[in-house]
């Protein structure tokens, strides 16, 4: 069964590929394989809206089942920022390091610098080319470190320390992060839907013989 990972980010692609390979035989490809593809601009207010927006566009473009996700980092002391601006906090053309730098600058301006609680919200969606949508949500609570730590991961990983851990996401081995992150939790919740779609695909194949 052919399935697209609607991302060109190496870390996300590796994580999702590893998840799919545990579930069955898939012909997996991603947006890395299509460098000229132009994804839609993310205009959603929530991770669910963005995941569905990205997934529907890709599924209809490539005419196959698609997995898409979106995450937002929310810091209550900053009024919910970066929130829907998580991917563009320091500007549309800024990179991950720029976003982290701006976040730390904002944290230093707080009257109460002790309150560094934060959480990630994530939605992962499985979408057919005909608009059938399955979705799963997950979140991860933690705190924002005072400085960047670690060299793996991406985005805000060098700043986010999950509750019950002392390391930032970027300091955790990739195999561990792929078990405890918000995206990993959402993928686990999505698993029954992926298995059902695969089973139906295999059944349809047998009936056509």
Curated annotation (Swiss-Prot):
<dbReference type="GO" id="GO:0017111">
    <property type="term" value="F:ribonucleoside triphosphate phosphatase activity"/>
</dbReference>
<dbReference type="GO" id="GO:0005829">
    <property type="term" value="C:cytosol"/>
</dbReference>
<dbReference type="GO" id="GO:0009117">
    <property type="term" value="P:nucleotide metabolic process"/>
</dbReference>
<keyword id="KW-0460">Magnesium</keyword>
<feature type="binding site">
    <location>
        <begin position="7"/>
        <end position="12"/>
    </location>
    <ligand>
        <name>substrate</name>
    </ligand>
</feature>
<feature type="binding site">
    <location>
        <position position="71"/>
    </location>
    <ligand>
        <name>substrate</name>
    </ligand>
</feature>
<feature type="binding site">
    <location>
        <position position="177"/>
    </location>
    <ligand>
        <name>substrate</name>
    </ligand>
</feature>
<dbReference type="InterPro" id="IPR029001">
    <property type="entry name" value="ITPase-like_fam"/>
</dbReference>
<comment type="similarity">
    <text>Belongs to the HAM1 NTPase family.</text>
</comment>
<keyword id="KW-0546">Nucleotide metabolism</keyword>
<dbReference type="GO" id="GO:0046872">
    <property type="term" value="F:metal ion binding"/>
</dbReference>
<dbReference type="GO" id="GO:0000166">
    <property type="term" value="F:nucleotide binding"/>
</dbReference>
<keyword id="KW-0479">Metal-binding</keyword>
<keyword id="KW-0378">Hydrolase</keyword>
<feature type="active site" description="Proton acceptor">
    <location>
        <position position="70"/>
    </location>
</feature>
<protein>
    <recommendedName>
        <fullName>dITP/XTP pyrophosphatase</fullName>
        <ecNumber>3.6.1.66</ecNumber>
    </recommendedName>
</protein>
<dbReference type="GO" id="GO:0009146">
    <property type="term" value="P:purine nucleoside triphosphate catabolic process"/>
</dbReference>
<feature type="binding site">
    <location>
        <begin position="154"/>
        <end position="157"/>
    </location>
    <ligand>
        <name>substrate</name>
    </ligand>
</feature>
<dbReference type="GO" id="GO:0036220">
    <property type="term" value="F:ITP diphosphatase activity"/>
</dbReference>
<dbReference type="Pfam" id="PF01725">
    <property type="entry name" value="Ham1p_like"/>
</dbReference>
<comment type="subunit">
    <text>Homodimer.</text>
</comment>
<feature type="binding site">
    <location>
        <begin position="182"/>
        <end position="183"/>
    </location>
    <ligand>
        <name>substrate</name>
    </ligand>
</feature>
<feature type="binding site">
    <location>
        <position position="70"/>
    </location>
    <ligand>
        <name>Mg(2+)</name>
    </ligand>
</feature>
<dbReference type="InterPro" id="IPR002637">
    <property type="entry name" value="RdgB/HAM1"/>
</dbReference>
<dbReference type="GO" id="GO:0035870">
    <property type="term" value="F:dITP diphosphatase activity"/>
</dbReference>
<dbReference type="GO" id="GO:0036222">
    <property type="term" value="F:XTP diphosphatase activity"/>
</dbReference>
<dbReference type="InterPro" id="IPR020922">
    <property type="entry name" value="dITP/XTP_pyrophosphatase"/>
</dbReference>
<keyword id="KW-0547">Nucleotide-binding</keyword>
<comment type="function">
    <text>Pyrophosphatase that catalyzes the hydrolysis of nucleoside triphosphates to their monophosphate derivatives, with a high preference for the non-canonical purine nucleotides XTP (xanthosine triphosphate), dITP (deoxyinosine triphosphate) and ITP. Seems to function as a house-cleaning enzyme that removes non-canonical purine nucleotides from the nucleotide pool, thus preventing their incorporation into DNA/RNA and avoiding chromosomal lesions.</text>
</comment>
């Amino acid at each position: 069964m052919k399935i697209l990972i609607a991302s060109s980010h190496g870390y996300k692609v590796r994580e999702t590929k590893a998840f799919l390979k545990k579930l069955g035989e898939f012909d997996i490809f991603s947006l890395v394989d299509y460098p000229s593809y132009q994804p839609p601009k993310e205009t959603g207010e929530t991770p669910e809206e963005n995941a569905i927006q990205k997934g529907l566009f890709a599924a209809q473009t490539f005419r196959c089942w698609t997995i898409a996700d979106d995450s937002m980092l929310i810091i209550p002391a900053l009024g919910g920022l970066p929130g829907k601006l998580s991917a563009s906090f320091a500007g549309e053309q800024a990179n991950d390091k720029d976003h982290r730098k701006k976040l730390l600058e904002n944290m230093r301006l707080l009257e109460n610098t002790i309150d560094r609680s934060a959480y990630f919200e994530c939605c992962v969606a499985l979408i057919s080319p005909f608009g059938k949508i399955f979705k799963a949500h997950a979140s991860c609570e933690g705190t924002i470190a005072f400085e960047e730590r670690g060299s793996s991961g991406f985005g805000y990983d060098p700043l986010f320390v999950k509750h019950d851990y002392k390391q930032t996401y970027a300091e955790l081995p990739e195999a561990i992060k792929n078990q405890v992150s918000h995206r990993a939790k959402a993928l686990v919740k999505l698993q029954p839907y992926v298995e059902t779609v695969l089973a139906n695909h295999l059944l349809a194949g047998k009936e056509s013989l």
